[in-house]
Amino acid sequence: MGNPEKLMTQIFDLKFTSKSLQRQARKCEKEEKEQKLKVKKAIEKGNMDGARIYAENAIRKRTEHMNYLRLASRLDAVVARLDTQAKMQVIGKSMANIVKSLDSALATGNLQKMSETMDNFERQFVNMEVQAEFMEGAMAGSTSLSTPETEVNSLMQQVADDYGLEVSVGLPQAAAHAIPAAKEKEKAVDEDDLSRRLAELKARG
């Protein structure tokens, strides 16, 4: 990634991808709300089988929503790292000019010019350090997101409670639906691993 223009192109592409992931996250969030509304209507009609199907759909959309947000967050962290590297390359290129300016100021005894040059140089590195700290915080924060494991039964009960509805048919124990939730979590982990590999390949390109 020694070519600055190529690096900037990669940064632009990753930012675009991150925005696309965020749009997909919003879409999934909207679809989750639609499915929860269908749960409400099905419960009102006493259609518990239908309510269960809609609840499963809502949970799947919620999981997809969180996965998209997680991927977008991780991409943003990669972009921050690449952006920092790009700025370091710019500083590296200007290093020769700064050293030359300092030598000139020292030779002529112009302490004011030397001080101004150092102020400018140090300011660039302060900005770099702030950005690096922000990037590290984003990287750490992205790992705190976890895939929801809300059970179908609890979601149905939540919708019923929100709308003051009585669940006319007894709901089975949540344990009966633990396996689908586990599969959703396993799928999320697989997607995380894939996204990490894609980000690494793109960063090396």
Swiss-Prot record:
A Pfam family of this chain: Snf7
Recorded GO CC terms: ESCRT III complex; multivesicular body
UniProt keyword list: Coiled coil, Cytoplasm, Endosome, Membrane, Protein transport, Transport
Coiled coil: 13-51, 109-140
A biological process from GO: endosome transport via multivesicular body sorting pathway
Cited InterPro entries: Snf7_fam
Domain of life: Eukaryota
Stated role: Involved in ESCRT-dependent multivesicular body (MVB) formation and sorting of endosomal cargo proteins into MVBs.
Record protein name field: ESCRT-related protein CHMP1
Lineage of producing organism: Eukaryota, Viridiplantae, Streptophyta, Embryophyta, Tracheophyta
Gene: CHMP1
